[in-house]
């Protein structure tokens, strides 16, 4: 089976976005938003030329081919994050005991979940904002991984353990991920 001598992925840089590559660190900036990420793997080189980010690998193995595609996705998500941002929508569901959800500082507090006396908490990652309005929770930010992790933290905080989830359906559930309805 013939092997490719060179793998080259190119990513267009929009006009209002600035991409800087310093060693292994890729920095993407647009306006006030900036994301940095260390991308280092032996044999893979990242550079900018003619308004494009170029990821190259000569005589790649399977793992290096996969890593090139992964880095392309990471950089594309960074560019999308600083230009448009990412938004997850969660919905609050309860049958009998109304939950009170609020976001303060870097935590989301959930009171009266299934009539419990204690407060459940979920961590908000850096650079992520959480807005609670009625029975909807909106998680938004520039870093896709941090926004997704914050939404998952909120969803996991209302996980019912030791009960049949077909009956006890109270909780906070993700209904939209970065524009995709679930």
Swiss-Prot record:
GO terms for cellular component: cytosolic large ribosomal subunit. SUPFAM superfamilies: Ribosomal protein L6. GO terms for biological process: cytoplasmic translation. GO terms for molecular function: rRNA binding; structural constituent of ribosome. Keywords: Ribonucleoprotein, Ribosomal protein, RNA-binding, rRNA-binding. PANTHER family: 60S RIBOSOMAL PROTEIN L9, 60S/50S RIBOSOMAL PROTEIN L6/L9. Belongs to the universal ribosomal protein uL6 family. This protein binds to the 23S rRNA, and is important in its secondary structure. It is located near the subunit interface in the base of the L7/L12 stalk, and near the tRNA binding site of the peptidyltransferase center. NCBIfam families: PRK05518.1, uL6_arch. Part of the 50S ribosomal subunit. This is Large ribosomal subunit protein uL6. It comes from Methanococcus maripaludis (strain C5 / ATCC BAA-1333). The lineage of its organism: Archaea, Methanobacteriati, Methanobacteriota, Methanomada group, Methanococci.
């Amino acid at each position: 089976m013939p092997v490719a001598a060179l793998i080259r992925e190119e990513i267009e840089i929009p006009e209002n976005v600035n991409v800087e590559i310093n060693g292994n660190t890729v920095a993407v900036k647009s306006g006030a938003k900036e994301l940095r990420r260390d991308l280092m793997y032996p044999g893979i080189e990242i550079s900018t030329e003619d308004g494009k980010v170029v990821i190259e690998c000569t005589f790649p193995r399977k793992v290096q081919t996969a890593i090139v595609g992964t880095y392309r996705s990471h950089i594309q998500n960074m560019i999308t994050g600083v230009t448009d941002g990412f938004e997850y929508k969660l919905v609050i569901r309860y049958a009998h005991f109304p939950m009170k959800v609020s976001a303060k500082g870097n935590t989301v507090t959930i009171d009266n979940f299934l009539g419990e006396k204690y407060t459940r908490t979920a961590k908000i990652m850096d650079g992520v904002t959480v807005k609670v309005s009625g029975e909807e929770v909106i998680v938004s930010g520039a870093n896709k991984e941090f926004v997704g992790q914050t939404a998952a933290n909120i969803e996991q905080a209302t996980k019912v353990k030791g009960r049949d989830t077909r009956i006890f359906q109270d909780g906070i559930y993700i209904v939209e991920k970065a524009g995709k309805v679930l």
